[in-house]
């Protein structure tokens, strides 16, 4: 540690949205608590995913929609690290950058928020009428929910959380409800709006969902040293296993791939990691499932193994329609 050149100032990059700022401020506060002599500043910017709101995420492309601009700032030295929702970070990072920390994973579930004016706050997905319109910008959610609730229709809904709530409440948009990640609603203190928590048996979650990913320059030992205490081992094992799987599937962040990853016998010598995964086509009519369990320390290889099983079962054929676009 004595060989690391210390700095008295650290600059964190963040997207400008309220949720992104809450997440980044949490990281800033942890760093300052652990390193009281360091000044920590936040520099914000909009990413492509923030600016282009009239096109679905899957059609824009998948090369770091919510990360690229911040990555460029790291590479040119404008910022020292960047805070992202881990599910938005591509599995293949630009040369010169690395994932410095994965924070403790919080709620991984998705939630249904009903249009209370139309259906009442406590309406469930299964209770909605034929043809009800649900807002979601995630192909993963849409595919799994079409599989479970074929009577529903889905329409893209983009923007930050506050914008999406306004779109839901605007009758001219025709939404009967929308699907959002519980973790974001918790951070924004908006859980009172939740009508239903969608169980894993209906919809598996996104790779990395519920954790923050902190990206930094590869070889910046000082930044890595201040990030090390923020790494949550159990969450890191689960999320890195999922990212290893996604990397080999070559699916990207915006295709219908869902996971549920669990640790058993935590912190015991026989600790194991279990991954359940699903790959679907857009309407959920075709899907492939797989499950694997093994020693948790082999998280990276377990991710590769379940990816290979999915590939052997035909996942590439299902995903080819998305990867081409």
From Swiss-Prot:
Pfam families, from UniProt?
Porphobil_deam, Porphobil_deamC
What is the species listed in this Swiss-Prot or TrEMBL entry? Answer: Dictyostelium discoideum (Social amoeba)
Cellular component GO terms held in the UniProt record:
cytoplasm
Of which family is this protein a member? Belongs to the HMBS family.
Relay the cofactor remark from the entry.
Answer: Binds 1 dipyrromethane group covalently.
Entry keyword annotation includes Transferase:
yes
The record's keywords, sorted A to Z, are: Heme biosynthesis, Porphyrin biosynthesis, Transferase
Q: Which reaction does it catalyse?
A: 4 porphobilinogen + H2O = hydroxymethylbilane + 4 NH4(+)
List the protein's name. Porphobilinogen deaminase
